[in-house]
A protein has these predicted regions:
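Single conserved hydrophobic/aromatic residue that forms the stacking wall/gate
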Residues: 1-9
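Hydrophobic/small residue at the entry helix of a nucleotide-binding pocket
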Residues: 161-163
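RNA-binding accessory domains that recognize and position tRNA/RNA substrates
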Residues: 9-154, 167-211
């Protein structure tokens, strides 16, 4: 899907950790979007969230129970609730939210058990202004720095493994790369040239478009 089908919003609350919210404006392929985001340098993790309006604690508890019911068919799991607030005038503090939601979850799903050390389900509840985000899955991102934040470099791309790996590692540090390949027929074949082109395409999945000179 085109990125124009999504709305991006930036946030820097909750302790200063930067967040970018991606809201779908049309139907999309979930796996395709997650796969694309896991190849974007600068992203540490991707969290698919259910975002609701703040309509009081009872509504929040019902939404959490509904979320768990849909997300986990097997309820014989251990869990922990981790609530965080940017709106400090919320009528309950984070610890109270954790305990109250935990109690509601145990009432709804008696087979679930609390484990605050190594839970199988870490339920995150983030109260941000007038909205609340609920999630329990975090897909690891590649980390690194966003492409273009550390200048440009030229990559000497050959048909071996070292040069594409070097290109990947440099791009992960925020460097925008172009590639150069020395094609010297008859000493290098068209097959060798095509291999370099294919390697450039693989690296470009992470680095963005690469001009191959």
């Amino acid at each position: 899907r085109s990125v124009s089908a999504f709305l991006l919003n930036r946030s820097s609350d909750l302790g200063g950790y930067g967040r970018i919210y991606v809201n779908a404006l049309s139907d999309y392929d979930y796996d395709e979007v997650i796969d694309s985001l896991t190849r974007v340098f600068g992203i540490v993790g991707i969290c698919p969230v259910v975002q609701i309006e703040d309509n009081g604690f009872d509504d929040l508890a019902n939404q959490v129970i509904n979320y768990l019911d849909k997300a986990y068919k097997n309820k014989n799991l251990t869990f922990k609730v981790n609530a965080r607030r940017t709106r400090k005038n919320y009528p309950m503090n984070s610890m109270e939210i954790n305990m109250e939601l935990g109690g509601r979850i145990l009432d709804a799903f008696p087979e679930m058990k609390v484990d605050v050390h190594k839970p199988e389900v870490l339920l995150q509840v983030e109260i941000r202004g007038d909205v609340i985000n609920i999630y329990s899955i975090e897909v690891p991102g590649p980390g690194g720095m966003p492409i273009g934040t550390a200048g440009k470099a030229m990559l000497l791309l050959s048909g071996g493994i070292d040069s594409p790996v070097a290109g990947y590692m440099v791009a992960k540090r925020g460097v925008q790369i172009e590639a150069t390949y020395f094609h010297a027929p008859p000493y290098t074949s068209e097959r060798a040239k095509q291999k370099v082109i294919d390697l450039a395409k693989i690296v470009s999945k992470y680095s963005g478009p690469i001009t191959l000179n």
